[in-house]
């Protein structure tokens, strides 16, 4: 089984409740890596203790996971999906590439805990995310952003 199919096998619970899983991902990202919260102007004033259950955090987390779902379902044929995301994250949001690596690890942890992603699935997700992040980084370099 390929990496994409292995991860998609566990995607159902995430897809069934993007808001809850997205909220968990961003809350964990911000609590484990507090500096990342500063990259989201609308979340800067939210206390760490108030992140979980915050509707705006959950909504943005849902957006992140929906996009990841599109990327997973594209099974590597993702240039048309990824290009606009990479452009906006470089030129508008100014998100350093290392932050994609941080959120990728958090997504893996949340999927393991909440969707049953096993060890092989976690490695498959790491492989997929490494490719996606490398493609984002290539766009960043083309744009002169690093």
Curated annotation (Swiss-Prot):
Binding, O2? 60
EC assignment? 1.7.-.-, 1.11.1.-
Question: Is Kinase tagged as a keyword?
Answer: no
* Residues reported in the UniProt entry to bind nitrite: 60
Ordered alphabetically, the record's keywords are:
Cytoplasm, Heme, Iron, Metal-binding, Muscle protein, Oxidoreductase, Oxygen transport, Transport
Q: Which reaction does it catalyse?
A: Fe(III)-heme b-[protein] + nitric oxide + H2O = Fe(II)-heme b-[protein] + nitrite + 2 H(+); H2O2 + AH2 = A + 2 H2O
Which Gene Ontology terms cover its molecular function? heme binding; metal ion binding; nitrite reductase activity; oxygen binding; oxygen carrier activity; peroxidase activity
* Ligand binding (heme b): 89
The enzyme's main class, written as a single word, is oxidoreductase
Domain Globin, chain residue ranges per copy: 2-141
Gene Ontology terms, cellular component aspect? extracellular exosome; sarcoplasm
Protein location: Cytoplasm, Sarcoplasm
What does the annotation say about its assembly with partners? Monomeric.
Question: Which family does the record assign?
Answer: Belongs to the globin family.
User: Know the name of this protein?
Assistant: Myoglobin
Q: Provide the species name.
A: Tetraodon nigroviridis (Spotted green pufferfish)
Query: Coding gene?
Result: mb
């Amino acid at each position: 089984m390929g990496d994409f199919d292995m991860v998609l096998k566990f995607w159902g619970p995430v897809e069934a409740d993007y808001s809850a899983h997205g909220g968990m991902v961003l809350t964990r990202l911000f609590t484990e890596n507090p500096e990342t919260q500063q990259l989201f102007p609308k979340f800067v004033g939210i206390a760490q203790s108030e992140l979980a259950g915050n509707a705006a955090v959950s909504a943005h987390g849902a957006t992140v996971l929906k996009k990841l779902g599109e990327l997973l379902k594209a099974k590597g044929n993702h240039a048309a999906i990824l290009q606009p995301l990479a452009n906006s994250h470089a030129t508008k949001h100014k998100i350093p590439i290392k932050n994609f690596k941080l959120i990728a690890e958090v997504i893996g942890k949340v999927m393991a805990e909440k969707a049953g992603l096993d060890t092989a699935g976690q490695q498959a997700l790491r492989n997929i995310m490494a490719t996606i992040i490398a493609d984002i980084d290539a766009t960043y370099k083309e744009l002169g952003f690093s």
